[in-house]
Amino acid sequence: MDSNTAPLGPSCPQPPPAPQPQARSRLNATASLEQERSERPRAPGPQAGPGPGVRDAAAPAEPQAQHTRSRERADGTGPTKGDMEIPFEEVLERAKAGDPKAQTEVGKHYLQLAGDTDEELNSCTAVDWLVLAAKQGRREAVKLLRRCLADRRGITSENEREVRQLSSETDLERAVRKAALVMYWKLNPKKKKQVAVAELLENVGQVNEHDGGAQPGPVPKSLQKQRRMLERLVSSESKNYIALDDFVEITKKYAKGVIPSSLFLQDDEDDDELAGKSPEDLPLRLKVVKYPLHAIMEIKEYLIDMASRAGMHWLSTIIPTHHINALIFFFIVSNLTIDFFAFFIPLVIFYLSFISMVICTLKVFQDSKAWENFRTLTDLLLRFEPNLDVEQAEVNFGWNHLEPYAHFLLSVFFVIFSFPIASKDCIPCSELAVITGFFTVTSYLSLSTHAEPYTRRALATEVTAGLLSLLPSMPLNWPYLKVLGQTFITVPVGHLVVLNVSVPCLLYVYLLYLFFRMAQLRNFKGTYCYLVPYLVCFMWCELSVVILLESTGLGLLRASIGYFLFLFALPILVAGLALVGVLQFARWFTSLELTKIAVTVAVCSVPLLLRWWTKASFSVVGMVKSLTRSSMVKLILVWLTAIVLFCWFYVYRSEGMKVYNSTLTWQQYGALCGPRAWKETNMARTQILCSHLEGHRVTWTGRFKYVRVTDIDNSAESAINMLPFFIGDWMRCLYGEAYPACSPGNTSTAEEELCRLKLLAKHPCHIKKFDRYKFEITVGMPFSSGADGSRSREEDDVTKDIVLRASSEFKSVLLSLRQGSLIEFSTILEGRLGSKWPVFELKAISCLNCMAQLSPTRRHVKIEHDWRSTVHGAVKFAFDFFFFPFLSAA
């Protein structure tokens, strides 16, 4: 047998039979290896050394060996490079017993042998021994593995992945690996390769036992928390058996901040609180675990209930729910206006983003509980590995749990930009002020205690600055106290920003300094460990100050004290509130037509009721539970982003072209772009030249010639026409008006005109009040009065006429005009400038010579939103939200 032969690993080739002389240590190794091949002795534990099971995890030595290795590390004793008195056989036996230092020495020995002979075989064996040592957290073995990986020595397709994984481990992960090894063998005293989860749970109590055994007296609460945490850690895997590698991987995920969700599903005191409760009082997840038979019976009853409801499915096939849904949808969409969107969209954005803020804050509270459990597990690991870098572990945890904070800040962005635009009449500012104050306090209490001096001072500074800023708007007459909140000097900083010198400004500067100090902790790693979590408290506090400015004293009393007292007075107030509610509803119904309301509600509720019947699996409890999941927040943020981008594109399109208030007269336009210019050159050249006038807002005077209706839109009529004939006539009379009867008493011109159509109409009633009209007005140039009062032929040229498009809001004034009326109108030059009969949009109109009884004398102006000033106000509010009272937008 070859004297250089190593124990064969699964990926190593057979050694060549070429003996060579070696040193005395190698002869000792040869003898031990020959004995190993012939007898195959196994050391205590699941693994003896490299061989058929070389890829398995190595078991550590007995507890006495653990203390021996600790003393060797402390005293610097044990096998070293210069210590040649210890025979290699003894080192090999230690390596087989699981000593990581001996395994490293054996790996180094075979690396030296690989330099002389059988390089591939010895290198492969050395890597196998080094892998075993690296799995126990041996730093020297990791360095040698990195060198082997770089030189491709002993690296095969079977071990390359494992070598890369061990070589890339950080010091923190190696420390966690060491602690996990000790904990695993305490949980597995029989040194099995795989242990059942139930057996591990039975041995959890042994982890907290010291060398002298269990300590007398009650178990400290910290040890109880560590024991519960360890039980959750063991039961976090779905496997029935857990091996050493599985346990180590769980702890490595912990080191990276990826904590199993089962660790934080419930509080530490849940088991004590749920003791003695009946199955009906337990949550669903605990009911399934603790009382499975009772849960199965409930599921059976639920399935029977679903089966009974499924019989209603045939009803949905008879009633055309999709058609009804489509009719309602198109009726709603066709009646939507820009005014409605300008009112509704900011409210939707505000409420959705505020709900998203609340959900993200609840997720942050959940993470604060995770922080507490995280530190409990850290303390447990520190008992077995004092070299564990706790700060680095906390940094990893904080970095991997920044998602709810990012979602929260994005939600704050939407709240800030939508609040100044949204209608305050539809926002309960007093109630929201109380809610924001509550979340300010609770978010502060959930912060880490490591930065407590800075967070406490920051919150006190922020609250003081906010209260001082509120003093000038207080209704009380405290002139000396209000001076503290007033601005003494304003210094312009550029054209857009103003620097305010005041007491709140100085406090704000100090607050920024505290932010910097929090971020500076742990070499600026405190930015996402301490500063970002505190921003949740900061944003809630700033939002409460802003909403307080829109609140009233009575509303704050109602929101803070009234609702609290309402809980105690609930039995007495129920009857009174019910009576008041009935009276209010009766008053509301008497002011409206009850039949019309009932029919509308019934039609709209049919699809909803059928959908509820067919979707019996809908769970309100599940919906409430899902609010703490990030998927709901992501969905809200995606929709908010889409809505804001859509509105932004609309505003950008409508405000992109600046309107120029031109002094251009109609006569000048006619000379440049009228028939005279066409005759001098041609119409196409004239159109190209006149395109330079695009965007001019002009106010001209002209002669009204005629107006015509170009389009009539009635979505209600379209929807009713799709219904059966008798239902359609009934709904026309319900929602519309009946044709009047022709009688000598009809004095109204409109009634007289309608009564003539009664015999010709195919329905007894009409719903023309829902009509939306689009008009086109033809306007000619005004006549110039000559000396003899004659009009030139050129002035009455119809090719100089222009056409104005008008919406339904100009209906009243347009129907009162007569041919030849002198009108003043405003429009914007755009479109087919320089052609015959250019078409412009009517912006404003007034009649100059109409009789007062036919048309009001006021000017009819098209209602248009000033989107530019709206966006400017939102941006100014957002800037002041973040920087006031230090800076404010000009």
UniProtKB/Swiss-Prot annotation:
Q: Where is this region: Disordered?
A: 1-86
Chain intervals for the UniProt region annotation (Interaction with ATP6V1A) = 1-321
Pfam families, alphabetized: WC-rich, WCOB, WEF-hand, WSLR
| Localization annotation | Endoplasmic reticulum membrane; Cytoplasmic vesicle, Secretory vesicle
Which residue positions does N-acetylmethionine occur at?
M1
Q: Which residues are glycosylated?
A: N661, N746
Substitution effect: R653C: In DFNA6; uncertain significance; also found in a patient with type 2 diabetes; uncertain significance
**Location of Phosphoserine modifications:** S32, S157
Annotated tissue distribution: Highly expressed in heart followed by brain, placenta, lung and pancreas. Weakly expressed in liver, kidney and skeletal muscle. Also expressed in islet and beta-cell insulinoma cell line.
Q: Could you tell me the superkingdom of the organism this chain comes from?
A: Eukaryota
Annotated Pro residues bias: 10-20
Question: Cross-referenced InterPro entries, in alphabetical order?
Answer: TPR-like_helical_dom_sf, Wolframin, Wolframin_Cys-rich, Wolframin_EF-hand, Wolframin_fam, Wolframin_OB_fold, Wolframin_Sel1-like_rpt
Q: Which residues carry this modification: Phosphothreonine?
A: T30
Q: What does this protein do?
A: Participates in the regulation of cellular Ca(2+) homeostasis, at least partly, by modulating the filling state of the endoplasmic reticulum Ca(2+) store. Negatively regulates the ER stress response and positively regulates the stability of V-ATPase subunits ATP6V1A and ATP1B1 by preventing their degradation through an unknown proteasome-independent mechanism.
Q: How does it assemble?
A: Interacts with ATP6V1A.
- Disorder cited: Wolfram syndrome 1: A rare disorder characterized by juvenile-onset insulin-dependent diabetes mellitus with optic atrophy. Other manifestations include diabetes insipidus, sensorineural deafness, dementia, psychiatric illnesses.
Q: What is this protein called?
A: Wolframin
Say which species the protein is native to. Answer: Homo sapiens (Human)
